[in-house]
UniProtKB/Swiss-Prot annotation:
One of its GO terms (cellular component) is cytoplasm. Residues 112-122 have a biased composition (Pro residues). It is found in: Nucleus; Cytoplasm. InterPro entries: CITED (IPR007576). Interacts via its C-terminal region with the CH1 domain of CREBBP and EP300. Interacts with all TFAP2/AP-2 isoforms. Residues 23-122 are annotated as: Disordered. Signal peptide: none annotated. This is Cbp/p300-interacting transactivator 4. Acts as a transcriptional coactivator for TFAP2/AP-2. Enhances estrogen-dependent transactivation mediated by estrogen receptors. May function as an inhibitor of transactivation by HIF1A by disrupting HIF1A interaction with CREBBP. May be involved in regulation of gene expression during development and differentiation of blood cells, endothelial cells and mammary epithelial cells. Its main location: nucleus. Keywords: Activator, Cytoplasm, Nucleus, Transcription, Transcription regulation. GO terms for molecular function: transcription coactivator activity.
Amino acid sequence: MADHLMLAEGYCLLQVPHAPRTLQPYPGPGLDSGLRPRGAPLGPPPPSGTLAYGSFGSPVSFQPFPVSQPPGAGNAHLQSAATPSPGRMPAPPSAAGGPSPLQPAPGAASPLPLPPPPPLPPALGCMDAELIDEEALTSLELELGLHRVRELPELFLGQSEFDCFSDLGSVPAAGSVSC
């Protein structure tokens, strides 16, 4: 089924003799694989009038979609999507060439007053409005054992918590290396 995908690179199904390919060394920044300068057109220059449209011809001869549709064909979804959302006023028909209805004209007053922005959450480092009771803090400190923090030795980076087995308070197993 996928045998055609597992062919060796450069293998052609058509049994046509081909010239051996040679790889060109990288020529530098201004060239594409040494074949042509970048931006240079391939082949002879096209006749005038076909520069922008290539082999499709002029835009009059190539139209990918029909210009007119029968009434009611495929526009029900577009009509529902084109209805203005609540809170937005549709643009008057005279404003077709004017500013976008989503952006107010400079110097014009907004038709609907804007609600005030929601309050920002308190930033880190700000004091809360509620003060915490000092007794609650000390009881929490005692409960968690944080009052002993000043008694513990400082641990520096690169040091292990226990330098020797004697720090553990138990006898090491027989045959182990001690400090």
